[in-house]
Amino acid sequence: MQSSPDASDIEMLWTVATARILLGSEMNLQVPPNLSADNYEIYLEAGINDWGGVSPLTIDYVNPEAPWPQLADLQSRSASKGFELRPRLPIYPEFFTKSHVKKSEMLRTHIENLIDSDGYVKGGMSRYVATD
């Protein structure tokens, strides 16, 4: 893949939109925002619902040449398309809140201390981005 050309924006948008149609609204679709830094918010319109593991602390180890966007910018661009940026744990909220996975008592207690009633990180983006 290293010698393969990157997919164009049109190819990526088509792929995301097709995946959304085929996989349905319950499937989580990710597109890393750092791989199309100029216009990454367009993928929200195509059907993604997750930016993946964006980190303000680490580089993208898979694509170290592509820095993560600032969280405030990611939040602003998401909001511009009508979406609320919400931090989550590595486990998707529905897998915990709907009990799709078996959990030990210790793990369940630890996760419950970290999440809100919707299964997202308590405190939301205000834990990571200063708000006015």
What is each PLM-predicted segment?
Residues 1-132:
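Auxiliary Fe-S-binding modules of radical SAM enzymes
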